[in-house]
Amino acid sequence: MKQRLQDSIDLKMKYQTRSYNQLAFVNCLQGKCEEAIQNLSTAETILRENHEDEFDKRIIITYGNYAWVYYHKGQLTKAQSYLDKLERICQQFPDASRYTAMIPEVYGEKGWSLLNSGVQQYKEAMECFETALEQDPSNTDWIVGYAIVLSRLEQLSGVTESVDSSHSVKQWRRVLKLDPNDAEAMVQLALKLRVFEQYEEADTLVKQALEKSPGVPYVLRYAAKFYRCAGNIEKALKLLDKALKMSPNSAFLHHQKGACYQNKIKTLKKTRGSIDSGKIDKLINDCKDCFTKAFELKPSFIIAKLNYAHVCSINGEYREAEKIYNELLELENTCPENKQDIRFEVGLFEQNYKHSKSNAIKYLLEGFKIKYDSKSRNNCRTHLEKIAENPQQDIVAFCIRGIIHMLDGEECFEKILEIERGKIVTCSR
């Protein structure tokens, strides 16, 4: 996270104040309070120079962070001085508390902070953006944040919608209606449209985005992802190399480059006839190097580790793959989606490479039993159902179906209880 924030600052991307505030928070957590104070001082200077007319609204977060950092430094008088500044500002807003005014600017910034804090915070981030937009519906900054979090939640759910029912598509179109030159919104919308097979419009949007912002890393990386998903691997690699020159320490970019090599490996493996073993070996090494770099830069990058293990499996390095899978299975402090991803990939490894049907079922069931709606959970279910499609109708198939039906029944019962609790709360008001 710290590297990503530093990249956004070094590349002079929009909303640097936000990056400095979040960097201050990270530095304070790491005990680097002096660096945190310097980050906040820079954020304050940017606001004074660029937003003089809205300074009081926009400075609330920064002053709150000042108070928090000085409190952690043990400088209580200094912390109180910033609380006093907040109190004077909050007096301007009728519904404000003593030190906090819950105005759109505060809700919006809180939404961005939560969005950058990980998957567990996405739903609360969505609610913050919704609240901000209720009061300021034309603020493209909040709409972009709202569109991003909706896109991620839709992707996590694994539920295939239609282009007309996708809430994130509506929000990305809303951004472009207010700001037709927003290249970042163009590539994000293009990625969503490609999912719904709107290929022509998606391709046009990516080309327009690259014409408008050919040197913006954010545009380059998502355009590269678009071309990789479209099968144009060479185009994707070219864009990723360009982006890496500007952001050499981006775990995301290294991972995307590894994913491109992984696609090339799969294509070559499927090719009939003689295969250049030297070419395959080089691709595998390049692929592993990219994934290694990604999780070295971001140790919590579970997908990069899973991808690395999968490449080891393809290359016959089963012991290395198994070692990584076992390490990942022992992780406790990770989000439910990561736990599902791990168990799904381990299940496939057991089924396809170790040829252990019983172990595959064990891990796929573990993934499915984690009650968190996600694409990986759906994948676990789909593979279990395929295993259960046994023409001999053996006891294993019946057990799998029984467990799936039992879990479905539990979830239906829990939803009924939630609805009934909601009725009771409504009646008691």
Which residues does each PLM region occupy?
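Short coil/turn linking the two alpha-helices of tandem helical-hairpin repeats
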Residues: 51-52, 74, 116-119, 147, ...
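Short coil turns that delineate tetratricopeptide repeat
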Residues: 14, 57, 137, 180, ...
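Flexible helix-coil transition and linker loops at the boundaries of alpha-helical arrays
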Residues: 4-13, 46-57, 89-103, 142, ...
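Residue-level signature for tetratricopeptide repeat
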Residues: 26, 69, 113-115, 149, ...
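Canonical positions in the second alpha-helix
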Residues: 8, 43, 86, 132, ...
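Structural register within alpha-helical repeat arrays
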Residues: 16, 23, 66, 103, ...
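TPR alpha-solenoid repeat register
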Residues: 19, 96, 142, 185, ...
